[in-house]
Each structure stands twice: as structure tokens, then as C-alpha cells.
Amino acid sequence: MTSEQFEYHLTGKEILEKEFKTGLRGYSPEDVDEFLDMVIKDYSTFTQEIEALQAENIRLVQELDNAPLRTSTQPAPTFQAAAQPAGTTNFDILKRLSNLEKHVFGNKLDDNE
């Protein structure tokens, strides 16, 4: 998306130079100026953010265009399971679990059987 796709009605400079008509009970010029100062700051911030996002978008599109295509013939990266420490087998794990249950539950396990 480029800025040509959006229509901007005002620039920060146009907001700054805007003159307001005042009547007998018109707006306070100080209040209007203070508010417009905030609008100008926000407008400038939005413009900077849009430019930064457009630059990032261009960079990412170029990065994507330059990235090699992954085809079905290329295997997806796989994660290998962590190697078990020496001596740790399913039997050892079950034995540890049994000992832990006996320690935690004590005679309660024997009473339920």
C-alpha cells in the first residue's frame, strides 16, 4: 500500500496556518491554537509512523521475494528429541514413580488394594 491510495485533506503546515473567524462570542484564540498544536504533533507522528511502516513493508516484501521457495521435496526442519541421560529407561522411570508413590501415600495405597 502506498500513500497514493489514500487521500489526505490536510497537511501539518495547512493545519498550522489555518485562520479561524471569530465573532462576538467566538472561540478563544489561545484554546484553538493549543488544540491545533496537539493536532499538528499527532499528525506529524502519524506521518512518521506511516513512512516507517511503508519502509518496513518494502523491506519485508523484498526479503520475501529474495527468500528461496520451499518445495515439497525439501524436508521441513525437524527437531530432535533430547537424548535421554545414560541409565534412564522406562523401567527406571516406573521404578522411581513407584517409590515416590509409596513415599507420598505410604500405607494408603496398601489399604485400598
Swiss-Prot record:
GO CC, any one term: cytoplasm
Compartment list: Cytoplasm
Major subcellular location class: cytoplasm
UniProt xrefs under Gene3D superfamilies: 6.10.250.660
Coiled-coil stretches: 36-68
Keywords per UniProt: Cell cycle, Cell division, Cell shape, Coiled coil, Cytoplasm
GO biological process: cell division; peptidoglycan-based cell wall biogenesis; regulation of cell shape
Phenotypic consequence of gene deletion: Cells lacking this gene have increased lysozyme resistance, which is important for escape from the host innate immune response. The lysozyme resistance is OatA-independent, but is dependent on PgdA, and an increased N-deacetylation of the peptidoglycan is observed in these cells. The phenotype is suppressed by the concomitant deletion of gpsB and pbpA1.
Keyword Cell cycle set for record: yes
Keyword Lipid metabolism on entry: no
Family the UniProt entry places it in: Belongs to the GpsB family.
PANTHER family recorded: CELL CYCLE PROTEIN GPSB, CELL DIVISION PROTEIN DIVIVA
HAMAP family xrefs: GpsB (MF_02011)
Binding partners and assembly: Forms polymers through the coiled coil domains. Interacts with PBP1, MreC and EzrA.
Role noted for this protein: Divisome component that associates with the complex late in its assembly, after the Z-ring is formed, and is dependent on DivIC and PBP2B for its recruitment to the divisome. Together with EzrA, is a key component of the system that regulates PBP1 localization during cell cycle progression. Its main role could be the removal of PBP1 from the cell pole after pole maturation is completed. Also contributes to the recruitment of PBP1 to the division complex. Not essential for septum formation.
Protein name: Cell cycle protein GpsB
Species, as recorded: Listeria monocytogenes serovar 1/2a (strain ATCC BAA-679 / EGD-e)
Gene name tied to this protein: gpsB
